[in-house]
C-alpha cells in the first residue's frame, strides 16, 4: 500500500488556517490575474505554479464548500486539467468536498447547491457556469455524516466527567 498524498484546501483563509491547509485561490494561483493586468506575466507560468503547489497529491480536500461558486468550481476543473495535462474531470485528481450547504453562500456567484437545484428545475435557464458545475457535481458520490451539535457534545461531556 502506498501513502495517499493529499492537498488540503478551503474556500476562505480562516477555514484554511484552521485545518492547516491553503486556500483554493492560492492553489489556483489567482495572483496570475493581477500580474497579467500589470503586464508582468511574460515569464510567469500559472500552470507550472499550480503543479508545484499540488506536488504529488492525488487527492484535493476542499472544506467550506458552501462558499464555492460555480465559476470557481469550473475554473478549478479547467486549471487542474491544464496542470495535469489530462482531460478527465479535475485533471484526473480525486476531489473531496466537505462542508454544510446551509452555511455561508458563495460571494457574487451562484453556489454549488443552487446549481444542483437549478439544474433539476426546467423553468430556470441556468447559465454556462451553473450547467458546468451541475455536470461536474453529478459525477460525485454523496456521503452524509452524522450531525454533531454542540449541545449534545456538551451534555455528553457533563455526564461523563467525574
Language-model segments: residues:
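Conserved ATP-binding/catalytic motifs of P-loop helicase motor domains
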Residues: 1-162
